[in-house]
Amino acid sequence: MATYMANAKTVSPRWLLVNAEGKTLGRLASRIAAILRGKHKAEFTPHVDAGDFVVVINVDKLKVTGNKTQDKQYHHHSGYPGGLKTINFADLQAKKPQRILELAIKGMLPKGPLGRQLYRKLKIYAGDQHPHQAQQPELIDL
């Protein structure tokens, strides 16, 4: 008997809703990355997008342990000499709270075309409202 390999025709994604209020950043990000990959399903296949859509709400209420609120730095570069920009966790959470979780999850997904496809299935919102009510997402507790 041949080994089962999932493909786009056999996989049916679900919509899941995650409330990030009071959750720790890294633990939440790793669980969401596994769901996006489809590792929670029996038919997981490494080279196939077998994951589910994930809608995350209340990311403005994420927490981190220790002194990371002030010590954790996020860097990006403009490409020009002297163009390194740095912002700490507290300031980024005040300006763009969804960007923190986006960066954490994106780093945990595969690099390349499959990783970009999986990343598009992630929807992150700072408040408790989201525009995906029509998909009837199931609330899960991580």
Curated annotation (Swiss-Prot):
Record-linked PROSITE patterns: RIBOSOMAL_L13
Subunit structure and binding partners: Part of the 50S ribosomal subunit.
Keyword Ribosomal protein on entry: yes
Protein purpose: This protein is one of the early assembly proteins of the 50S ribosomal subunit, although it is not seen to bind rRNA by itself. It is important during the early stages of 50S assembly.
Transmembrane stretches, start-end: none
Protein name: Large ribosomal subunit protein uL13
Assigned GO CC terms: cytosolic large ribosomal subunit; ribosome
Molecular function GO terms recorded: mRNA binding; structural constituent of ribosome
GO aspect biological process, one term: negative regulation of translation
Family, as annotated: Belongs to the universal ribosomal protein uL13 family.
InterPro entries membership: Ribosomal_uL13, Ribosomal_uL13_bac-type, Ribosomal_uL13_CS, Ribosomal_uL13_sf
